[in-house]
Amino acid sequence: SALFPALKAMGEGCGAKLFYLTARNTTQAAAEDAVARLRAAQPGLALRSVTLTAKEKACLHPDAEGHPACLPEVCPFANGYYDRRKDALAALLDGSGSFSRAALADTARQFSVCPFELGLDLSEWCDVVIGDYNYLFDPVVHLKRFFDAAGDWLFLIDEAHNLPDRARAMYSAQFAKSSLSEAKRALGKGKSSLKTALTKADKVFLAARKACTQAAPRIGAESVSYTHLRAHE
């Protein structure tokens, strides 16, 4: 019900691109279906939509878990991507105009390109971009190609009441004490300025754990901070 007036406003020059943002896959599918219905109701309607999927979910690498970093030297879909993306984009743009996760994956396999990067590049050619909240609100993974500068964009935010919890997660940093221990072990034996700094940081974690443990009886176990829990590692 919200898509139609938003697209109508775009047709009247009130926006160049519509971003439909939701945290739920089912709602993304519903948005895809709504766009498809509008396109079917107006056979001559030139309307393209793409659904963006998180990189780890879209990845086609057969050993993705073994290669958490997206590196051309270990991924055949990333290696030479820019040499092959033009043909992949051309094949998609000659198609139906509705680009789901499955459609991107099929084309990515055909042309041996990264489906995640293909979706990002394709979004520049689409009228409607469907995806998660973080593509707009997360300071680390937001769509820089669109939001690093002002643009004539329209936004539909599904279930916006969920944004405060998501925003807290997006703007919060986490660091585990176990990371310090692993770094110190990696440095091996002997002294170094880096190992000294890691030792000092380790002491800060231990002090925080002690302070939280002492405060826990007063504030209740449910209120103990996440920092306290991670400091036990």
Where are the model-predicted features located?
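Conserved small/polar residues in nucleotide/adenosyl-binding loops
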Residues: 227-233
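Secondary-structure transition/capping motifs at alpha-helix termini
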Residues: 11-13, 41, 149, 160
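Short, glycine/charged-enriched secondary-structure capping and boundary segments
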Residues: 6, 33-37, 65-67, 143-146, ...
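Signature of the SF2 helicase/ATPase Hel1-core->accessory helical subdomain module
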Residues: 116-121, 133-223
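A substrate-engagement module of RecA-like helicase motors
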Residues: 14-129, 137, 199, 206, ...
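Walker A/P-loop NTP-binding motif
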Residues: 2-13
